[in-house]
Regions:
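Conserved SAM-binding motif I beta-strand of class I
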Residues: 349-354
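Non-catalytic substrate-recognition/targeting regions of SAM-dependent transferases
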Residues: 198-211, 229-308, 316
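C-terminal catalytic and target-recognition region of SAM-dependent MTase-like enzymes
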Residues: 394, 421, 435-497
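Mobile active-site "lid"/loop adjacent to the S-adenosyl-L-methionine
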Residues: 378, 395-425, 431
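S-adenosyl-L-methionine
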Residues: 358-394
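Conserved class I S-adenosyl-L-methionine
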Residues: 324-331
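Non-catalytic accessory regions of SAM-dependent methyltransferases
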Residues: 69-214, 244, 254
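Conserved SAM-binding loop of SAM-dependent methyltransferases across substrates and taxa
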Residues: 334-347
Length: 497
């Protein structure tokens, strides 16, 4: 029996069974509804509740659940919760720090992390509007820095600079100049026409991602203040980048950069803007080049900005291990790893599987674009891997690159369980001595937690896993050490024995 919490361990030690406990689940749901509460230090798997849905480990024994409910009822009687209470709002006050610049915000506690959450804000200037650049003061009234303000977001302030640095046109141009300068130092224009120009917190521009695809700049926006200024930023970036250049031929669109703005619907709702209101100039699809492979990118309907530039270096490295190999690309999206393995690496065969039907269709187009044959399957990855295992199918190289499985801290346990299960299935499809590359793009999943899930998958299947490297995102995705989340991508290279 695989345990996820202390209750599983106690149940195992007591020899309890795994009988269904739906009635206990319903009773527990009825006891606590609404809000996010941390109720019992002994119930790690049930540390948080949201919208009345308990975070129960699947298969928890009836006796353990009953004991847990009793414990939580007693704990709950000691507190008076207000179910469904609204989240904290930033308080407005006319009494700011002495001599404060307007608009201002004063903090309860200061941090060098670029995110300042609502609970950290003591008071805000009534004149401060959503999206404004505000002067940020510490609790003693000293100027701490400047940031973008949005009282309706949980991230009330996104810090831009510390100390007395003014936020003016010169500031923005300097930041974009630093970002473009790094990409020039990396020599990316000589090897690809698809790379990340601005990496949000990694480039000290929290809330803004800019991707270059051919002659188009795609803006992915996470902050209202960035959305309000995106057209100015586009002009500044065009000045810094100069006219778009091609790897092998001039672009038909001419010397000017085209632009496109997109944002996740949930981000739009939280931050209070609509990307559709921005001018949309770019075509729905563009063709890019990377490592000699051509990819068609859907910047309108594709995931994120349409392509995963962060895996560029990992794609080439994997291709160099695929000469004459049978390759399985799990969660293949539009064929990034698989096509690079086939075209640049000389793989004997490539099979790609993904649940997104539109992505599979685009992967087929990309295979035709490169005049190669790959097998592409529209299926759920878990079901497909089980089917291949039942059929006795194995591969020389297996890539596991799922979408983000942990989007919030309350999803961490469930997301790690999915990583464990997916890797446990995939590792059984690797021939002895074969290679497996497994990835996580969830910033909330630490390196140790991810490695733990992989190690558990190996133990569960009886396969010895030899890690020969650990990599991350390509260098156009820099990491600021005061924001470890900017180093979100984890790529573990394994030899399966």
């Amino acid at each position: 029996m695989r345990g996820h919490c202390r209750w599983h361990a106690r149940a195992r030690n007591a020899g309890l069974g795994m009988a269904p406990a739906r009635a206990a689940d319903e009773r527990l749901s009825a006891v606590f509804r609404g809000g996010t509460q941390r109720l019992c230090s002994d119930c790690e798997a049930l540390a948080s509740f949201r919208s009345g849905t308990p975070r129960l480990c699947s298969g928890l024994p009836v006796e353990a659940r009953r004991a847990m409910i009793s414990c939580m009822e007693k704990r709950g009687s000691k507190h008076r919760f207000s179910p469904g209470r609204p989240r904290t709002r930033v308080e407005r006050s006319a009494d700011g720090p002495p001599g404060a610049q307007s608009p201002w915000v004063q903090l309860r506690s200061a941090t060098l992390h670029p995110f300042v959450f609502q609970r950290m804000v003591r008071a805000a200037d009534p004149a401060a509007r959503p999206g404004d650049v505000v002067a940020v003061y510490d609790k003693a009234g000293a100027l701490f820095g400047h940031g973008l303000f949005n009282p309706q977001s949980q991230i009330a302030i996104r810090m831009l600079a510390y100390g007395e640095t003014p936020i003016d046109e010169g500031f923005w141009r300097a930041r974009f100049g630093q970002a473009v300068g790094l990409r020039r130092q990396l020599g990316l224009d000589q090897v690809t026409d698809a790379y990340r120009v601005v990496h949000s917190e990694g480039d000290n521009l929290s809330g803004l991602i800019v991707e270059r695809y051919a002659d188009c700049l795609v803006f992915e926006i996470f902050a209202l203040g960035m959305f309000q200024r995106w057209s100015e930023f586009a002009a500044m970036l065009a000045d810094e980048l100069g006219p778009p250049t091609s790897l092998d031929r001039p672009y038909k669109a001419g010397p000017a950069w085209r632009t496109f703005v997109r944002a996740d619907a949930q981000i739009e709702a939280i931050e209070g803007f609509q990307a559709a209101a921005a001018q949309q100039e770019a075509p729905a699809r563009l063709v890019i080049r990377e490592h000699g492979v051509r990819y068609r990118v859907d910047i309108v309907g594709g995931h994120k900005t349409g392509f995963f530039c962060d895996q560029r270096d990992n794609r080439l490295r994997l291709a160099r291990l695929c000469g004459g190999a049978d390759v399985l690309d799990v969660c293949c999206y539009t064929g990034g790893f698989g096509l690079c393995a086939k075209v640049a690496g000389g793989a004997a065969s490539v099979t790609g599987v993904d649940l997104d039907e539109a992505a599979i269709e685009l992967a087929r187009e990309n295979a035709n674009l490169n005049q190669v044959r790959v097998d592409l399957v529209h299926a759920d990855a878990f079901a497909y891997l089980r089917q291949m295992q039942a059929n006795g199918r194995q591969f020389d190289v297996v890539v596991v690159d799922p979408p983000k499985l942990v989007t919030s801290r309350r999803d961490l346990e469930e997301g790690l369980a999915k990583h464990h299960d997916l890797n446990a299935l995939a590792v059984q499809l690797v021939r002895p001595g074969g290679i497996m590359l497994t990835c996580s793009c969830s910033g909330l999943v630490s390196r140790d937690a991810f490695l733990g899930a992989i190690h558990a998958a190996g133990r569960r299947t009886g396969r010895a896993l030899q890690m020969f490297d650990y990599t991350g995102a390509a260098p156009d995705h820099p990491i600021m050490l005061n924001c470890p989340e900017s180093g979100y991508l984890k790529a573990v290279w394994l030899r399966v024995l």
